[in-house]
Amino acid sequence: MARQPPPPWVHAAFLLCLLSLGGAIEIPMDPSIQNELTQPPTITKQSAKDHIVDPRDNILIECEAKGNPAPSFHWTRNSRFFNIAKDPRVSMRRRSGTLVIDFRSGGRPEEYEGEYQCFARNKFGTALSNRIRLQVSKSPLWPKENLDPVVVQEGAPLTLQCNPPPGLPSPVIFWMSSSMEPITQDKRVSQGHNGDLYFSNVMLQDMQTDYSCNARFHFTHTIQQKNPFTLKVLTTRGVAERTPSFMYPQGTASSQMVLRGMDLLLECIASGVPTPDIAWYKKGGDLPSDKAKFENFNKALRITNVSEEDSGEYFCLASNKMGSIRHTISVRVKAAPYWLDEPKNLILAPGEDGRLVCRANGNPKPTVQWMVNGEPLQSAPPNPNREVAGDTIIFRDTQISSRAVYQCNTSNEHGYLLANAFVSVLDVPPRMLSPRNQLIRVILYNRTRLDCPFFGSPIPTLRWFKNGQGSNLDGGNYHVYENGSLEIKMIRKEDQGIYTCVATNILGKAENQVRLEVKDPTRIYRMPEDQVARRGTTVQLECRVKHDPSLKLTVSWLKDDEPLYIGNRMKKEDDSLTIFGVAERDQGSYTCVASTELDQDLAKAYLTVLADQATPTNRLAALPKGRPDRPRDLELTDLAERSVRLTWIPGDANNSPITDYVVQFEEDQFQPGVWHDHSKYPGSVNSAVLRLSPYVNYQFRVIAINEVGSSHPSLPSERYRTSGAPPESNPGDVKGEGTRKNNMEITWTPMNATSAFGPNLRYIVKWRRRETREAWNNVTVWGSRYVVGQTPVYVPYEIRVQAENDFGKGPEPESVIGYSGEDYPRAAPTEVKVRVMNSTAISLQWNRVYSDTVQGQLREYRAYYWRESSLLKNLWVSQKRQQASFPGDRLRGVVSRLFPYSNYKLEMVVVNGRGDGPRSETKEFTTPEGVPSAPRRFRVRQPNLETINLEWDHPEHPNGIMIGYTLKYVAFNGTKVGKQIVENFSPNQTKFTVQRTDPVSRYRFTLSARTQVGSGEAVTEESPAPPNEATPTAAPPTLPPTTVGATGAVSSTDATAIAATTEATTVPIIPTVAPTTIATTTTVATTTTTTAAATTTTESPPTTTSGTKIHESAPDEQSIWNVTVLPNSKWANITWKHNFGPGTDFVVEYIDSNHTKKTVPVKAQAQPIQLTDLYPGMTYTLRVYSRDNEGISSTVITFMTSTAYTNNQADIATQGWFIGLMCAIALLVLILLIVCFIKRSRGGKYPVREKKDVPLGPEDPKEEDGSFDYSDEDNKPLQGSQTSLDGTIKQQESDDSLVDYGEGGEGQFNEDGSFIGQYTVKKDKEETEGNESSEATSPVNAIYSLA
């Protein structure tokens, strides 16, 4: 027959029946034992110490107690016996000490005010309640008063005083207008904690309403209103601005006292124009961020749950643009008594020893007073078995007569604590608390525990026997726990039998028997296998099981981890599952579960269903797919203590099958409104059993997922709250670290809603010093930190943090090692030795400090060093201190990156978590001469085709005595490289002119500075490309990448670019010609870092590019790359790439040649941007960085705005083709002048037409009667110039202007009458009119006119 589970009371008895620390006995919760055993009284319920009642209701003063026999009750009022029988209005409830004062028949509640105390008594002692102070709530009326209008100057401060009537409890104050509208408050107008209304400065709009102070009384639910204030504001032409001044509190300093555990409220209200801002600070530390909050527009600082470490000086700073003032508030934290060790009930057996401990703390230190049965201990009869030692009472060899109730009253000026603890002496023979002759069945090879709860006084000893014989079972495969349970670590067949537990004390013994049966395990020996089947076929899944024949076997099947519904198409047998006519919905995982009442085994297989080959293509596949619709109609069923079934109706899949469902939950205690993932289920289910945590008010929703995406969440389900339980885990990440030298802050990660398991989650914090193994200190904390004060410096502690709620405590936590606070080290490294290794590095060696002087964890040795001066005269150096760290307990190290040729000083310290220790003796050393840095601003200019001008500046860091410069240069043309030439210059020379030997080639220059040690870092530049280097082509400008080296060299951007790295890598020429209207672009490959570019980049020589682009690969981390600049003469377009999120803002920073820096903020998605108001021909450096993090920046690039012609072109006046053209024109003009001069001096004959009607042709030969004196060759240039310049005028296209004239001696006219007229006698005016029409058509005249 199967063993029935024991009733719940057995588990309770099992947990509570045994002894606790110090040999004390806990009485089990078994009602029969509770009713049988005698017990002194214990107060179980009482009213609050300050008990305020509503005068309209009856007065109720609670007092309830338990004990055996049941206690009787009586009261004192104002320390005198209160005779209830004499007052008809006062009665006491039956079986209770609660007082009821009834005023239905009249009477005034005020007559019963006073201090009450309840006494609960039986024959074994008397328990006391707290002293309950009864007060009747009061809501007095406002005194009548006439308020004159308040006249105030505009901009002046103003305080409207409320002065509410004193109420009990104090009323809530608020201000209203005459129209019953709340007064709008802001940082200018606000209500103080005292109820007054403060105006930092009055404005005209303030007199548009009246101001009335209102007091709301809590108990009577009444509101009293003060007569309203009327404001009259006097206006002025201009409100003068004023520095702030404090309206409350007055002066520059004040003090405030607060009790531990209460809220501290500090307030500062200031006046001024404009309205001041208020800021709060704490002297010597930060405000406690976890419990400090600002109120009333930063005018009030509230610190909740004040502790001793919150004492100190706080100050508020009021400031506006006219100035600032501050007020210091000295805060003192006092404390009413609070428990360190509250006395607990003590149950002993006759002759046993025990103790009551009453330990409390407070400020000032509280006093402890012991009482017994309500009387001072000094007045009680002497007891030789009792000894009082301050806060402890020690009992030795207790007897039955020692039973009593002890009271511990600890008090100081701020309050008191009263605790009752009884001492009960019991002599009870052993008793068994579990049913007799239980049957326990277990599975072979498992672990099991046999329980035998018992009770007795004195505490019995328990032993186990098997089959009524043999020795006590303990050791080997058996283990007996302190509570008496017997554990069998691995069950074997031979362990089957009858086990007897025997409990014994001096009063007798009791025994019980447990019968143990061992069963074979359930095993699946033939498991179902994964299968692939076509739709419409039959599938069989096997599941063959072996089990104990005495146990009933049940075989069930799950599909996708949910119970499988066996329909008409399925057949379930003992060893298989058959599916007929397989369909797509049958696809999924199948689980065979073989179970008995003791154990189970399971096996899984996956069924894949393929579509039939003859099945036509799904016509839905062509339809557009979308995210599924939200699930709907969520329903909770099968409500259990730790689980619930959630069912939903799927939404439309929108042509894409639903693959998964995600169930989310929300709880309304810890994170209301925040949804968390609970579990995930296949898309084929629409119901799931959800495992729940205790004491969570759940609400669920479901999200469907397909290949397109997730649906909108479903509407939430109804809420379901689970019952509570003790926590099953403890908080994690427990740490102990000091924040000051004399404390240790214990912190942990608080538990969330699903691990709290009950209301009022709190944490029991325990600690003790690791070395001393002293008793544990403990405190209960509601937050996630606790500060242990008055600790030695850097001492290890054992720390435990245990979760607890109203249902009980969590499991016993493991200890964590923490350390108290560190103090500054007390010693410095000694015997510091410095050895100069080279011009930039030294080695250090020192002796370690003693460990006891570190006063903390030794983090590192640190060297502070600074450059005192340079050995070069008149060279200013920065004396900024630098540091080098040497982590761990080391004795030597190296300091590098020093400046050569300099005097240095060095000190060493030891560093712990607190900071630096004292400095060692200062050591001085000198670094030898080194090589200089690169020359600055190396510039290459080409004024003409014959020379190249070089200019540079001295190195920024000479690093020694400069002896000169070395210039190396070489000519190159494509892949051809000439011979390298080396020039040496004096240290004062900063210019050099190179005479070009080849006007076609370009030059590469490398310049470095020298000291006695050698040459320093070199800088490389190239001459611009000549303009005739390119071949005609319409291709856009293309440039190979150039790597920017440490010198900051940037490649040229001429029409034909030759890319050369700073390592002198030769790249083939790519000839291109760029149209003059298209800006060329230089591409520079570099690596983006998250720091600003090196200064050498910003000091790079200005390039002659029209546009600059930084081409880089996109890194994994957040970066900015591929910055592109397309400049014109007065503006430039900027673009870049980045991998920041959307909405990121950037800043473009650029600096011109005059070192003027400007920034342009760029809103998100605003690329490209345009920089305007630039100067033509000026060099700029530019970078782009993130507005949120300036450290994430692009590489610094350099560009130049364009001029009338680009700088890389030679001067046109020096070009050979231009000079040749000008010489040809000058020669032609000279020839024409000579011809004209000869003609003018000699004259000539011109051919005239032979017949009037025939015009003179340009190729006519000279006639016999009219010919030139020049030869035919002389006339050819004139004839040849008769044709128009464009070659389009034909012979017959010009009219002869002289065709109407006859022949005569004056006929010396050619077609240009104006020419002849200059050298012959003119005709009459009538004869010459009309001849001028041929003047413009004669090219000969044009040439002659040049003469």
Curated annotation (Swiss-Prot):
CDD domains xref list: FN3 (cd00063), Ig3_L1-CAM_like (cd05731), IgI_2_L1-CAM_like (cd05845), IgI_hNeurofascin_like (cd05875)
Phosphotyrosine: residues bearing it: 481
Composition bias type Basic and acidic residues, residue spans: 916-926
Transmembrane segments: 1218-1238
Disulphide bond pairs: 63-118, 162-213, 268-316, 358-408, 452-501, 543-592
Compositional bias (Low complexity): 1090-1105
Matches recorded under SMART domains: FN3, IG, IGc2
Extent of the signal sequence: 1-24
Biased composition (Polar residues): 1278-1291
Gene Ontology terms describing biological process: axon guidance; cell-cell adhesion; myelination; peripheral nervous system development
Coiled-coil regions listed in the entry: none
The keyword Zinc is annotated on this UniProt entry: no
Stretches the record annotates as Disordered: 713-740, 915-934, 1011-1040, 1090-1111, 1248-1347
Keywords assigned by UniProt, alphabetized: Cell adhesion, Cell junction, Cell membrane, Disease variant, Disulfide bond, Glycoprotein, Immunoglobulin domain, Membrane, Phosphoprotein, Repeat, Signal, Transmembrane, Transmembrane helix
Topological domain ranges for the Cytoplasmic compartment: 1239-1347
Subcellular location: Cell membrane
Domain notes: Homophilic adhesion is primarily mediated by the interaction of the second Ig-like domains.
PANTHER family associated with the record: NEUROFASCIN, PROTEIN SIDEKICK
Illness association: Neurodevelopmental disorder with central and peripheral motor dysfunction: An autosomal recessive neurodevelopmental disorder with early onset and a highly variable phenotype. Disease features include hypotonia apparent from birth, poor feeding, global developmental delay with absence of reaction to touch and no eye contact, infantile-onset progressive ataxia and demyelinating peripheral neuropathy.
Family assignment from sequence similarity: Belongs to the immunoglobulin superfamily. L1/neurofascin/NgCAM family.
Protein name (record): Neurofascin
